Amino acid sequence: MSFIRLHKDAAATWLSRLLPAAIFILVGLFSIMVIRDYGRESAAARQTLLEKGNVLIRALESGTRVGMGMRMHHAQQQTLLEEMAGQPGVLWFAVTDAQGVIITHSNPGMVGKSLYSPSEMHQLNPGPQERWRRVDVAANGETVPALEIYRQFQPLFGMRGHGMRGHGMARSANDDEPAKQTIFIAFDASELAATQAREWRNTLIVLSALAAVLLATLLAFFWHQRYQRSHRELLDAMKRKEKLVAMGHLAAGVAHEIRNPLSSIKGLAKYFAERTPAGGESHELAQVMAKEADRLNRVVSELLELVKPAHLTLQTVNLNDIITHSLNLVSQDAQSREIQLRFTANETLKRIQADPDRLTQVLLNLYLNAIHAIGRQGTISVEAKESGTDRVIITVTDSGKGIAPDQLEAIFTPYFTTKADGTGLGLAVVQNIIEQHGGAIKVKSIEGKGAVFTIWLPVIARQQD
């Protein structure tokens, strides 16, 4: 069953990683497709207008050519242009000379006026191929978007090779070449502008939806990772509590069985110490027996404290006062080892509900471990600050020898110690007290560069079971 459960957990882990990756790929592909398709509809509509403009220009050139062959005058060309300007979507037709002066126009009143200045005509640089640009023109008393198509007006192009000359056409100084003329046609681009706006709106909606899917996937992935991390922490806490319960039953029996003989051993050791001369070997052995009995009794007491839920006396406390008091308790020891204690009170720090004696015990354990890790000449820094609106953080940083990477995970395990004379229960008790407050404790360390213990405590504590 454990083998099957292991494979299920592994499959779920891989699936949780593959699904976001697959969604990222799909979102990327859809985004590329949407971006590539953007502008396709408006480009097709614009191409339709360009082709229509080309047909009308060629028709006007053809009509002009026929009229020239039949000796039609300029008035007939003007009439032809006015008739063609009645096509749906056409705003106006105009034929200008090289200086931008209107020769013929769909609006007869514009003939002889300047459509564009010579400098603007130079910038437009009309050639034999159609060109286009977006402009705003006045129509029916309002400004509308227009697509302006223009190129050189070449009514004589089809007559070359037939020995014919146009009548009524302007000539340049060189009589072999006609004066350059430019034909302009303006189409109503309102539908084109609406199509582009619709394309932009639809593209924006699709991209926003894809971005929302991507964001939802990222959030779901991080929430899943957070859930897995919380699940693992909960399982670890349950396993630790199960071990503590088992140890509690064992410790209760061991304490009862050990303490009674210890009391007898300690009493006999004191009896022999009083009956033997001071300085003698028997006297020293009796004192060693008494000290070892005290040490063993202390270990049993620490074990009982670890496995039994701590009874907290919660009250509103000022962390600045607790930290200052706990530092004063170790100041003499730190001063004798030339270790600096650094702490600056945070006057804006919220008061929290906690057991001041238990918190002092926690901090003392961390200070003493730091002093032991430093040895001589170092620094212990303590900082307290708020984390959001409902938690505070206490960090204890030392400049000691640090903790090896392979020891970090086991640092809070009962009976694990890096000290030759330690019991390995100090940090386990610290973790137990912090968790009873509803908080958490973590450690970071780089071997040779010290360690940082971080404690998270809720502002409003509720004793945990």
Swiss-Prot record:
Group of enzyme by EC: transferase
Membrane topology: Multi-pass membrane protein
Pfam families linked to this entry: HATPase_c (PF02518), HisKA (PF00512)
Post-translational modification comment from the UniProt entry: Autophosphorylated.
InterPro entries hit by this protein: HATPase_C_sf, His_kinase_dom, HisK_dim/P_dom, HisK_dim/P_sf, Sensor-like_sf, Sig_transdc_His_kin-like_C
Stored Gene3D superfamilies: 1.10.287.130, Histidine kinase-like ATPase, C-terminal domain, PAS domain
Subcellular location(s) of the protein: Cell inner membrane
Cytoplasmic topology ranges: 1-14, 224-465
Chief location: membrane
Domain of life: Bacteria
EC number: 2.7.13.3
Gene Ontology CC: one annotated term: plasma membrane
Periplasmic side: 36-202
Cytoplasm is among the record's keywords: no
Residue(s) carrying Phosphohistidine: 256
NCBIfam families: PRK10364.1
Protein name, entry field: Sensor histidine kinase ZraS
